[in-house]
């Protein structure tokens, strides 16, 4: 990246076509052909050449069948071979990333401006191709020029294509204005100009697509060679805001939703927006339930004094129960300390089984089965709530403690006698955020009959 200063020029620039070039074939000397057609090149010029011309000279042509369907089948096979990942699909068009990090349609595989019995691939190393052409022109003409290898690309949010640099040598491909101040005194914090792409687009105005003019020269710019290449123009997928197409991003979100749920035991102090909890609860209430009922209620402990009173009472009961088991005091305190998460979490919600709509049976077996069915339904709603929180960036941890103190929970919270607490859910932003977990191997946990 070039240092701060103006990347443009107030003086006129020229964009000159290089006429008289042959139809290039594998093995041709591109540098010699350009030197012969443009002996007028001089120091500081920028030679802009289409990647197609470079590919032809470097033998990056693949024989293709004349039949349109077979040709298209081969093209798709080549796209698969050249691409390292697919970012987006629309109809039969694939937007891909190739091994160099270039993101464009069809991995640069192209059937234009080549024979109908051929398909062209991008150069293996466009930056190396640019450096080689620059060195060859220096050898033949004794001039110091910059070289850009270009290809046609679409642009996010805008119709139409433009040429962009895929290979570069001899010029600063980027110009950063960070720290510079404009004429109004405003500091330019993030402005960074893709000089190489601007030059590539300008040169295409004389190269065109149907003129058989694969090389142009841009003259009049102040070119600085900082050793950068076109690779510096590529933003890695991990840093790019648009590294997937819309449909693909939605699909990834669907596939990762379950995997985002983790048991988070340490939360940051950041407050939890109430609307996020309400939204997650609303989604959780769509979980499957028997008899078209709503067998779950979520009790949100929003009043700090109420939460503390409940947790203190549960702690006292837990201590008494453990002491009754004959456990030593040190062991009791370790076990009781595990419940501290419910004091520390920004929010706590208690899921309740509510038997409204449950069927009555004269025998214990079916009555127990009905209760089990309602319990499973509440469990489904709890899992749905945890996932709903996770997809909103909230961590959670389900803790079963209230199950062991059902009467106490009902008494402290003033709830009906037939409401059954099924644990407690601590909610907050994770102190140490983590990504989606890996799926488990079903192994012998998935039984086939």
UniProtKB/Swiss-Prot annotation:
Residues where coenzyme F420-(gamma-Glu)n binds = 321
Q: How is the cofactor bound?
A: Binds 2 divalent metal cations per subunit. The ions could be magnesium and/or manganese.
Q: Which domain of life is it from?
A: Bacteria
Q: SUPFAM superfamilies this protein is in?
A: CofE-like, FMN-dependent nitroreductase-like
The UniProt entry's sequence similarity note says:
In the N-terminal section; belongs to the CofE family.
Name the coenzymes or cofactors required. Mg(2+); Mn(2+); K(+)
Chain residues that bind GTP: 21-24, 51, 56, 113
User: Residues that bind a divalent metal cation 1, according to the entry?
Assistant: 110, 151
Give a short account of what the protein does: Bifunctional enzyme that catalyzes the GTP-dependent successive addition of multiple gamma-linked L-glutamates to the L-lactyl phosphodiester of 7,8-didemethyl-8-hydroxy-5-deazariboflavin (F420-0) to form polyglutamated F420 derivatives, and the FMNH2-dependent reduction of dehydro-F420-0 to form F420-0.
> What are the binding positions for FMN in this chain?
261-265, 289, 400, 437
InterPro entries found in the cross-reference section: F420-0_g-glutamyl_ligase, F420-0_gamma-glut_ligase-dom, F420_FbiB_C, FbiB, Nitroreductase, Nitroreductase-like
> What's in the keyword line of the UniProt record?
GTP-binding, Ligase, Magnesium, Manganese, Metal-binding, Multifunctional enzyme, Nucleotide-binding, Oxidoreductase, Potassium
Q: Does the keyword Lipid metabolism apply?
A: no
| Protein's UniProt keywords contain Nucleotide-binding | yes
UniProt-recorded Gene Ontology molecular function terms: coenzyme F420-0:L-glutamate ligase activity; coenzyme F420-1:gamma-L-glutamate ligase activity; GTP binding; metal ion binding; oxidoreductase activity, acting on the CH-CH group of donors, with a flavin as acceptor
Q: What is the organism field in this record?
A: Mycobacterium avium (strain 104)
NCBIfam families named in the record = F420_cofE, F420_FbiB_CTERM, PRK13294.1
> Annotated pathway, please?
Cofactor biosynthesis; coenzyme F420 biosynthesis
Reaction it catalyzes? oxidized coenzyme F420-0 + GTP + L-glutamate = oxidized coenzyme F420-1 + GDP + phosphate + H(+); oxidized coenzyme F420-1 + GTP + L-glutamate = oxidized coenzyme F420-2 + GDP + phosphate + H(+); oxidized coenzyme F420-(gamma-L-Glu)(n) + GTP + L-glutamate = oxidized coenzyme F420-(gamma-L-Glu)(n+1) + GDP + phosphate + H(+); oxidized coenzyme F420-0 + FMN + H(+) = dehydro coenzyme F420-0 + FMNH2
Task: Report which gene this protein is encoded by.
Answer: fbiB
| Entries under Gene3D superfamilies matching the protein | CofE-like, CofE-like domain, NADH Oxidase
Tell me the segments the record calls region Dehydro-coenzyme F420-0 reductase: 246-449
Q: Which GO terms describe its biological process?
A: F420-0 metabolic process
State its Enzyme Commission number(s).
Answer: 6.3.2.31, 6.3.2.34, 1.3.8.17
Name of this protein: Bifunctional F420 biosynthesis protein FbiB
In residue numbers, the region (Coenzyme F420:L-glutamate ligase) covers 1-245
């Amino acid at each position: 990246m070039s240092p701060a200063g103006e990347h443009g020029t107030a003086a006129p620039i020229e964009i000159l076509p290089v006429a008289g070039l042959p139809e290039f074939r594998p093995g041709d000397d591109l540098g010699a052909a350009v030197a012969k057609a443009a002996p007028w090149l001089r120091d500081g010029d920028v030679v802009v050449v289409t990647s197609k011309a470079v590919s032809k000279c470097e033998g990056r042509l693949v024989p293709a069948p004349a039949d349109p369907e077979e040709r298209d089948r081969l093209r798709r096979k080549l796209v698969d071979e050249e691409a390292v990942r697919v970012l987006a699909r629309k109809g039969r068009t694939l937007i891909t990333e190739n091994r160099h990090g270039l993101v464009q349609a069809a991995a640069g595989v192209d059937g234009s401006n080549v024979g109908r019995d051929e398909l062209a691939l991008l150069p293996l190393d466009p930056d190396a191709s640019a450096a080689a052409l620059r060195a060859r022109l220096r050898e033949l003409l004794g001039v110091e020029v910059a070289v850009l290898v270009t290809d046609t690309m679409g642009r996010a949010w805008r119709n139409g294509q433009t040429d962009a640099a895929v290979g570069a040598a001899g010029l600063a491909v980027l110009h950063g204005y960070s720290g510079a101040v404009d004429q109004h005194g405003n500091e330019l914090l993030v402005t960074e100009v893709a000089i190489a792409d601007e030059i590539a687009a300008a040169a295409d105005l004389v190269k065109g697509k149907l003129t058989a003019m694969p090389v142009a020269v841009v003259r009049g710019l102040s070119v600085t060679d900082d050793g950068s290449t076109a690779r510096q123009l590529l933003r890695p997928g991990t840093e790019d805001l648009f590294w997937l197409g819309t449909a693909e991003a939605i699909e990834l979100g669907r596939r990762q939703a379950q995997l985002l749920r983790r048991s988070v035991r340490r939360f940051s102090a950041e407050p939890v927006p109430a609307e996020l909890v309400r939204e997650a609860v609303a989604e959780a209430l769509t979980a499957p339930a028997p008899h078209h009922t709503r067998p779950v209620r979520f009790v949100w402990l929003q009043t700090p004094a109420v939460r503390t009173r409940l947790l203190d009472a549960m702690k006292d009961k837990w201590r008494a129960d453990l002491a009754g088991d004959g456990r030593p005091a040190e062991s009791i305190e370790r076990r009781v300390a595990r419940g501290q998460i419910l004091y520390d979490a920004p929010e706590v919600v208690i899921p309740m089984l509510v038997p409204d709509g449950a069927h009555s049976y004269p025998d214990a077996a079916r009555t127990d089965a009905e209760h089990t069915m309602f319990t499973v339904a509440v469990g489904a709603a709890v899992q749905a709530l945890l996932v709903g929180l996770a997809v909103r960036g909230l961590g959670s941890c389900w803790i079963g403690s209230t199950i062991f103190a059902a009467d106490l929970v009902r008494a402290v919270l003033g709830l009906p006698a037939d409401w059954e607490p099924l644990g407690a859910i601590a909610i907050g932003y994770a102190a140490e955020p983590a990504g989606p977990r890996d799926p488990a191997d079903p192994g012998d946990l998935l039984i086939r009959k």
